[in-house]
Amino acid sequence: HSLCGINCICNGSEEHFFNVVESKTENGIRVVPIADKTYPLFKKWYDEGCEYLLHTPDGKHFTYRNYYDSYWTSVMELIGCSHKPHDTRHTCVSMMTAKEVNPTLIKKIIGHSGAMSITEKVYTHVNVKELLEAINRI
C-alpha cells in the first residue's frame, strides 16, 4: 500500500499498525501505530482493497499535492483555519508530550531522526504494544 507517497506494508486490516518500508530517511522506515480513535478510518480504507491506502475516488495514487488541493484546503476553509498537513505532526507531538509520553517513543512514532541520540537510534528497541499504548494516550 502507499499512504500519500509513503510506501508501507499494512499487516492486515485487524492490525493497529503499519510498517513504512520506503522513506527519505533511515528513521522514516519504522512501525507506525494506528490509534484506536483513527483505526476505523484506516480499516475502511484498507478494506477497500485498493493498492493505495489513501487514493483518489477512481483508485489512483494520491499525491501529496492532489490531496492538499482537492481535500485539505477545502476542509481548512470550511473550518476557518490555515494549517498545513505537516502541522498535524506538531499537534501529535504536543499532545503526546502533554500526556507525558516517553520522548523516545514520540521520536520513534514520528520517525524523527535528527533529535535522536545514538543510544535512542541504535540501542533503544521498542515493541508495537509500547507504541500503541503511547499513541492511545492522546
Give, region by region, the residue ranges found by the protein language model:
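Basic, Lys/Arg-rich DNA-contacting stretches centered on the C-terminal catalytic core
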Residues: H1-T38, T56-D58
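Short clusters of hydrophobic/aromatic residues that line enzyme substrate/ligand-binding pockets
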Residues: V20, L54, Y123, I138
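Short, basic (Lys/Arg/His-rich) helix/loop patches that form interaction surfaces
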Residues: V32, D47-L53, P57-F62, D69-M116
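Catalytic-site neighborhood detector that most strongly recognizes the C-terminal catalytic loop/helix
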Residues: Y39, I110-R137
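Extended glycan-interaction surfaces of carbohydrate-active proteins
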Residues: P40-L41, E51
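Generic alpha-helical segment signature
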Residues: Y64-R65, L131
